[in-house]
Regions:
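Residues that form generic nucleotide/phosphate-binding pockets
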Residues: 39, 98, 125, 155, ...
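Structural motif
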Residues: 58-61, 200-205, 231, 244-249
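N-terminal cationic-hydrophobic initiation segments that often serve targeting/anchoring roles
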Residues: 99-103, 218, 258, 262
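Conserved non-catalytic scaffold segment of RNase H-like nuclease domains
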Residues: 2-124
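Amphipathic, non-transmembrane alpha-helical secondary structure
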Residues: 93-96, 100, 204, 208, ...
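Short amphipathic alpha-helical segments
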Residues: 1-3, 220-229, 289-298
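Interfaces that engage single-stranded nucleic acids at replication/repair/recombination sites
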Residues: 231-298
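Metal-dependent phosphoesterase core characteristic of DEDDh/y 3'-5' exonuclease domains
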Residues: 9-10, 63-83, 103-201, 205-226
Length: 298
């Protein structure tokens, strides 16, 4: 595990996903039923319908992503961002856009069993949903030693044979267990009961646990989650840049944000604003130069 000390923890992108069955109920005489039935025959499973709900979330061909949490370490605090959406395609598009902003050639993905589950599941669901994935998930053609992943399950396993659960590792290291009210087998049921907020909290606890496992393996003390802050002005600018409508409400948000900025940040914001009245990524922005002048002077 000494290799962990060679890298800056701020270059790590921590990821965890929670998955559910792709449909709330497996219907007989459908292509999905036939495919799952074949899987059951191959694995000597008798209860085709019953097994689907508990086991389908383990396979990208039969499950779907309920939410994805990404975490990063900034100023010795954990910063979290979670993506959840009933429309899985939109969820994956938003997620890949966020990864594109963070990831570079120094980025390491980190998670527990990320090489065997999270990363390939994301890759396959992107392909199924026709979503362009970030290249950091497209690793099937790479040599194993060039894949930029740190898997805490493999780091803990070392040269042994057994892979330990995240709960086992956190317990052994004296860290809080991420599994408080339920475990992964309950996610499918909770998802279709509409309890996505509970799933999100569960997912975020996993990411926090992995961050602190890595900290301890590096010989460092555990850290806490940063308190949530208001949306950064860049979020509003990005919304306009991507073709979002420039409304009176957005104008007020921008005015308030600019008024609170330092001189340096204000100059950067103005620089961004001045390039907005143009076609951005194929979309026509609705803000005008007159609007920008009013913002700067207001």
């Amino acid at each position: 595990v000494r290799i962990l000390k060679k890298y800056n923890l701020e270059d790590f992108l921590f990821i965890d996903i929670e998955t559910a069955p792709s449909v709330p109920e497996l219907v007989i005489d459908t292509p999905l039923y036939d495919a799952w039935s074949y899987y059951c025959i191959k694995n000597d499973i008798e209860d085709v319908v019953g097994s689907y709900f508990t086991e389908a979330p383990l396979y990208a061909e039969f499950g779907r992503i309920a939410c994805i949490t990404i975490g990063a370490v900034r100023n010795d605090k954990i910063v979290l961002k979670t993506f959840s959406n009933e429309d899985e395609k939109e969820l994956l598009e938003e997620f890949n856009q966020a990864v594109s902003k963070f990831a570079n050639n120094k980025t390491w993905l980190c998670g527990h069993v990320i090489t065997g589950f999270d990363a390939p599941f994301i890759m396959k669901r992107c392909l199924i949903n026709r979503v362009e994935m970030h290249q950091i998930f497209d690793m099937a053609h790479e040599k194993p030693w060039t894949v930029p992943y740190f898997d805490t399950a493999l780091l803990w396993k070392s040269t042994g044979f057994k892979v330990s659960t995240l709960v086992s590792v956190t317990t052994a290291l004296g860290l809080p267990s991420p599994k408080e009210e339920f475990n992964g087998s309950d996610v499918g049921r909770l998802y279709y009961e509409g309890k996505i907020k509970d799933i999100v909290k569960y997912c975020e606890r996993d990411v926090v646990a992995v961050v602190n496992v890595v900290r301890v393996l590096r010989g460092e003390e555990p850290i806490e989650v940063s308190e949530p802050v208001e949306q950064e002005p860049l979020g509003i600018l990005e919304y306009i840049f991507l073709g979002g409508e420039y409304t009176a409400e957005i104008a007020e948000q921008l005015k308030t944000a600019i008024s609170k900025m330092t001189k340096t940040d204000k100059a950067k914001a103005i620089e961004i604003l001045n390039v907005l009245p143009c076609k951005a990524k194929g979309k026509e922005t609705s803000i005008t130069k007159k609007d920008i002048k009013e913002l700067i002077n207001g």
